[in-house]
Design a protein with these regions (language model features):
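N-terminal binding-site loop/beta-alpha segment at the start of enzyme catalytic domains
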Residues: 247-311
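C-terminal helix-rich "cap/oligomerization" subdomain common to oxidoreductases
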Residues: 129, 204-261
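Alpha-helical elements of Rossmann-like donor-binding domains used by nucleotide-donor carbohydrate transfer enzymes
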Residues: 11, 33, 37-41, 51, ...
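Beta-strand-loop-alpha-helix segment that lines the small-molecule cofactor/substrate pocket
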Residues: 1-27, 301
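Short glycine-enriched loops at secondary-structure junctions
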Residues: 2-3, 55-60, 283-285
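Predominantly a Rossmann-like dinucleotide-binding segment in NAD(P)-dependent oxidoreductases
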Residues: 29-108, 114
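NAD(P)-dinucleotide binding in Rossmann-like oxidoreductases
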Residues: 113-119, 129-207, 211-220
Length: 311
């Protein structure tokens, strides 16, 4: 994904907008015509709630210093490939409801960890507000078909190359639709360019349109996916130093930025100018998020914090 956690993604999006700079997450499969076709079929033929099965799994034998399984390098199947099944589940449920995506309202996960407490494989059940359910899985020590199945009980979509979209089969792939009578319809997908070339073309077009975000991978989609990935990791207790504000090697909000000013006032007995705007400290998801928000508030000129936690 774009970053290790949702707080870092939030900070990048803020910088992108402040500096009028294009920021796009490199999810190649979302650009491909196959994915567009899947979402069109969902909108035309399926009704919520959906039942989704999505996997991205492979098996490799690598030392624990390898980036796939190294805690210090953000290793683990969830961040390496789990971001794919969780994103297509969100998109499919969104498409069934006439939206780009919907975020799950609950995530229950489990998995297998290595000696560094990094996930070698992970599975999760996602539940959505429309009662859709997605079962997803990622693994770097187990192989599977790595396919996607989406159904509403009447019509079913089967995707056997959801992530590479025919990249390794002469740029040709196929979708299968099965109705409740068992009748099958096959839809062939082919492109004259590779999946990564299509991704580069889309980025270039977005850049030349002077947009700061992609219409296919907007910022709120990337941020929502990262929040879901954070929750999935928390279920397995997979935690990186970058998730803990007190353990980060560098702050998310740079202290080299020129500090701004806010209107201030004086209170008798206190020798400091106090910002009239006070930061309420509740609703922080973790120390990482809290430190980033507090630093941002300080760099904007704030210096008064309300630390009460009961309202």
């Amino acid at each position: 994904p774009m970053t290790i956690n949702a707080t870092e993604t939030m900070a990048l999006i803020d910088l992108s907008r402040k500096n009028n700079t294009l920021l796009m997450e490199a999810f190649m499969y979302k650009i491909h015509p196959q994915t567009k076709k899947i979402m069109e079929i969902i909108q035309q033929k399926l009704n919520p709630p959906l039942n989704i099965n999505a996997e991205f799994c492979f098996s490799v034998d690598v030392p624990e210093t390898h980036r796939l399984v190294n805690r210090e390098l953000g290793g683990g199947s969830i961040l390496d490939i789990g971001c794919y099944p969780i994103s297509i589940a969100r998109h499919a449920v969104g498409a069934a409801n006439g939206k780009n995506f919907l975020n799950p309202i609950s995530i229950e996960g489990e998995g297998e960890l290595n000696s560094q407490e990094v996930d070698l494989n992970a599975s999760a059940i996602l539940k959505f507000e429309d009662e859709s359910v997605a079962k997803i899985k990622s693994a770097t020590n187990l192989s599977s078909e790595s396919d996607v199945r989406i159904t509403d009980g009447s019509n079913t979509i089967l995707v056997n190359q959801p992530w590479h979209c025919g990249e390794f089969t002469d740029r040709k792939s196929q979708l299968k639709i099965i109705d409740k009578e068992g009748n099958e319809e096959e839809i062939d997908i082919s492109t004259d360019k590779g999946i990564y070339a299509l991704e580069i073309d889309h980025f270039s077009e977005t850049f030349h349109s002077q947009s700061t975000e992609s219409r296919l991978i907007p910022h709120n989609d990337s941020h929502g996916n990262m929040i879901s990935l954070d929750t999935w990791r928390q279920e397995l207790r997979v935690v990186y130093d970058e998730d803990r504000g007190e353990r980060r090697k560098s702050p998310i909000i740079s202290n080299e930025i020129l500090r701004e000013t806010l209107p201030t006032l004086k209170i008798p007995g206190i020798d400091k100018e106090l910002s009239r705007l006070v930061f309420g400290c509740d609703n922080q998801s973790d120390t990482n998020h809290a430190f980033a928000m507090f630093d941002h508030f300080y760099m904007k000129g704030g210096n008064v914090f309300d630390t009460a936690y009961i309202y």
